[in-house]
Amino acid sequence: ANSVKGEISFNTHKLYDGGTNSPFTRLTNALNKIRKGQKLSFEEEYAIESFYHEILHTKTKGWELLRPHGWGDFKRTAMETVNQFVSRHEYSKFIERLGGTARHEKSVLKDGTGYKKWVERFREVIRKAKIDENEAYKHFEDKLINGKYGDLEQEVYEYFKNKAGLKVSETEFYQALEGDQTKWDNIIKTVS
């Protein structure tokens, strides 16, 4: 997690999925393996990606404290979705800067658990509209780093409205992104 002061904290408790290591243990194991030139497991590589997600929060120029989910807007939903999407595309470069090599990029992008449903649905719009995912990544990376967090809600909607032909309101889009599968299925049908 990331605080308003830019401090990053780590969960030292075991994972809910029955995993034997905490996220902190997986991260420290990954860093030690990179230092020793050893290959990372998927879980260790994903721990680096999760850490990089938090680093991205500190890199943004337009960082602002947003209201929690469910408080009448979707600013945090948009920001976390974009941050996670960008992080999954960029974390391998971070591993390289640390001296390691990412080997699970496709799996991390597809099977990462952070904001899983939102990122899957975000990528589904990209695929269905036949938008080049690398182009979308570059577009949103720039907006994330150089724009304001609070502007991402409208930025994501306008991007998909223009590039994917969304025919629903911004509120309907975000309610479906966060909501149940039936709502989402109805939204994705409008993508062209």
Where are these regions (language model features)?
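Post-HExxH zinc-binding segment in Zn-dependent metallohydrolases
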Residues: W71-K117
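Pan-zinc metallopeptidase signature
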Residues: K110-S192
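Short pre-active-site segment immediately N-terminal to the catalytic Zn-binding motif
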Residues: T12-F51, W71-F74
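Short, surface-exposed loop/strand segments
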Residues: I8
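Active-site recognition of the HExxH zinc-binding catalytic motif
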Residues: E45-L66, E80, Q84, R88
